[in-house]
Structure formats: C-alpha cells, structure tokens
C-alpha cells in the first residue's frame, strides 16, 4: 500500500465513501437515541437537584454539543456545571493529567454553589460531586419511566448507563475552562515546528479544556497512602477534546475517521486498550512529523495510515502511550498486560496487510 499512485487514492476514497460513511450514519442515529435518553434522565435529575442543569443541546447541523463518541457502542455525555469562579485552578503536575480546584483566598465556603462538596482543606471534591450525582441518577433509573430500557452500571464510581442493552453512555460532570491553558501543557506547541501555525495554535489554546469528575487510572489503584489517594480522588481530570478537534481538519480528520473504522472492524474486543482516543493521539503526533498540508492529501493518506499503525504497535509493545498535550499522562496506564499484548498482535496483523497487499483496503 505504500507509495503514491491512483490505486491508493481510489482505495482510500472507496473505503471512506462506503465503510466510513456507513459507520458515521449508524453512529449519528445512535447519538440521536443516546441524547434523547440522557436528556430525559437529566430532566428528572434536575427536578431533584437544580444545580445539575441539563446542558446538552442540539446544534443547527443536528449534532449534539456535549456528546463524545468513544466507539459505536460507547458514548459519553458531558454535563457542564456552573459557578467555578470562587475557586483557583491549581495545576502543579502533582497528579498526572489532573488539577484541583481550591477555594480562593478570602472566599468563604458559603459563597460557593457547591458548599457541601468542599473538603476541610478547601478543595472542591470531584469524588463527592460524582457520588451525589450517581445517587440521584440511580434513583431516577429505578422509576418505571426508565427501568425497562436503562440500567446503571456500578462497576466503578463513574455514572455509566446501559441503554437498550446495547449502548453504554457515561454521564460526566465537568467545568468548562475557556481561554486558559494548563501549565502541564505549557511546552506546546513545540518550538521550531511549522505545524500548527501560530494562528491555529492560539485558537487551540483559547479553546481551553474541561475539568471532569471521573475515575482515572490513578484513583482506580489501591493506594496505600491514604492522604495521597484522597487528594487524587478529589482532583479533576483534564480533558482537551475541543482543542484536539480544532487541530484535526481536512485530510487529518479523514485519516482519523478511517482509523476508527479499521479499529472497530479489526481491533475491537471486550476490554480493548485501543480506543478512538489513542488513535486520535497518535494522529496528532503524526501531524508533527508530517507538517505540510500535501502530506495529508489523498495520495499520501495510505502512508499516514501505515505510519500511525506502526506507531500504535510500538506504543503497545512499550506499554506506554503519552497524552498529546499532557505527556506525563500515560493512556495505557493500568491496562491489563494480556489485553495490550493481544492488541499489539491485532495491530501488527492489520498494518502488515496494509504494507504488503496493494489492495488491502478492499478486503478490510
């Protein structure tokens, strides 16, 4: 598949127009269903606890702000909370990929909308808010309105709902942080690289990030240091989907869409560590290696696919995949070794076929 010829262009476009577009149509229909269910749940949650306001909204193009697609069966809905203003955002790198919200000097607890979730040390606890939200959702799902087609999964402290016994949606509480950039990502963009250009880099930084209340690989581990464990549980995980998406347009986004489809068909199994997010991360790293726009045009997408999949194999063999913006955060941390090894075998089988078979995409 390596090389630049019309056969590669034909295969890439044919695969995109048939399989990728079919996947998009299927996912779009599922998102409509997921969004409808989540909005109904949040309506009942808000009736019990007015501070949890439904922020999920449909755009003029039919997309939903706040819905993230992890796979055709795994989704996430982000519920944005209000009134972060009385807290200072503290990102000192102590907790990988996370930051804490500390009551500002001179501010009283009573000035916060979330007063009962503030710890004795003055931190707004992500864990306490998540626990409260989970309890309310559990009560809502026990009502006849939802009990037939919704079930709360209680394998961890995240609010994860099984819908129609086919789809899983995680509902995540978050604060939106526009116009600021985390200290942990201060190294970006890397000096001397032509991509992204200065204007795009500034737009990306202005997009900011989300602080989310969720279980992380750190909080899932049994930490013998109770004080550290408590601090990590109270911390907020940084998510940078908006900033990442701003960087992926045109051929870069097309490449990612093809990779997602290949992942679903050839690397998906229960507990797989190869997520859409890891593929997105590797595409971003590939953008730094191939900065010119022409390198992401149709004649070169075959080479980009092979390069990214080879990098995936390398990450799986090393059992480490660094977050693009927050490199101290390992996206493969705490993943079972046997799952990583199996994924490495699947990824190598896939990329090997792409390299040796000039018509590989016709059969994949």
From Swiss-Prot:
Superkingdom of the organism of origin = Eukaryota
Protein name in UniProt:
Protein male abnormal 21
Induction or repression: Transcription is repressed by heat shock.
This chain's function reads: Acts in a cell autonomous fashion to specify the properties of the sensory ray and non-autonomously in the choice of hypodermal versus neuroblast cell fate.
The scientific name of the source species is Caenorhabditis elegans
Similarity-based family: Belongs to the mab-21 family.
Q: Which UniProt keywords apply?
A: Developmental protein, Differentiation
GO biological process terms, alphabetically, are:
cell fate commitment; embryo development ending in birth or egg hatching; nematode male tail mating organ morphogenesis
Q: What happens when the gene is disrupted?
A: In the male tail, ray precursor cells show altered fates. Conical sensory ray 6 is absent as it appears to fuse with ray 4. Males show reduced body length and uncoordinated movement in a backwards locomotion. Hermaphrodites produce a reduced brood size due to a decreased number of laid eggs.
InterPro entries for this protein: Mab-21-like_nuc_Trfase (IPR046903), Mab-21_HhH/H2TH-like (IPR046906), MAB21L/cGLR (IPR024810)
